Amino acid sequence: MPRRTAFFISDRTGITVESMGDALLNQFEVNLKRENHPFIDSPEKAHQLVNIINATAEKSALRPLVFSSIVDEEIRNIVKSSAGLHLSFFDAFLGTLEKELGVSALQFSPRINSIINTERYDARMESLNFTLNHDDGSSDRNLQHAEVILIGVSRSGKTPTCLYLALQYGIRAANYPLTPEDLQSPNLPNMVKPFRNKLFGLTIDPERLSKIRQERRPNSEYADILTCKREVSDAKAMFYRFNLPYANTTHKSVEELAVHIMQTCHLKRRY
């Protein structure tokens, strides 16, 4: 199958345009080469990028796809002059919204927008610092301020999920690893026991868990499939015993897990 190049262009980090572009591209079975170009925030950078896109178009029989989330109209128009198929999310929706709302778009520059978003940034960083300070049961200091506490066996996906909750939603997320001693106890671990209403369990298929642990400690009891089966079974028994909500991480992305946790625990994003 011929390979087409897809450019993801933004005047900021590019996360939004990648997500929206992927949502569209996932509907098609195509062979793609990806190129990410964040921080295209000046006419000079835009012209340089146009040269790259045009050079790619000349080398290929397939027109490049250009996904753009650039706010500035001047920069956006420069990128549109390239030989690629330009798909701008602002061009697609701003006109319709302006007509419906009866007002013109503000066309904030990235610099002004970053100043306006200072409060959101501060909330995100505060949540991230909290999550890092309460990763893997490292501290119970100020644990009462956690909005959710993920518990599960080692390598079940607690840390990446907490980090995503903090960065994407501004949630103060802590996590605690269930040790063999915890799993044999009829009680909740002492550190998290006072916060039962904030607990959310993560489980994982034993086979997947064993594979992940083998990468960390090959041929160890820790990674043995029987150990993994026992720990997963004991963890699920704990979740049932204390009627804790939980989710299986095996076939869920971090994004899907985060949304599920937000909905199940009735959490509100902080920005």
Curated annotation (Swiss-Prot):
It comes from the Bacteria. Its EC number is 2.7.11.33, 2.7.4.28. ADP binds at G152, V153, S154, R155, S156, G157, K158, T159. GO terms for molecular function: ADP binding; ATP binding; phosphotransferase activity, phosphate group as acceptor; protein serine/threonine kinase activity. It holds the Pfam family Kinase-PPPase. It catalyses: [pyruvate, water dikinase] + ADP = [pyruvate, water dikinase]-phosphate + AMP + H(+); [pyruvate, water dikinase]-phosphate + phosphate + H(+) = [pyruvate, water dikinase] + diphosphate. InterPro entries: Kinase-pyrophosphorylase, PSRP. Disulfide bonds: none annotated. Belongs to the pyruvate, phosphate/water dikinase regulatory protein family. PSRP subfamily. Bifunctional serine/threonine kinase and phosphorylase involved in the regulation of the phosphoenolpyruvate synthase (PEPS) by catalyzing its phosphorylation/dephosphorylation. This is Putative phosphoenolpyruvate synthase regulatory protein.
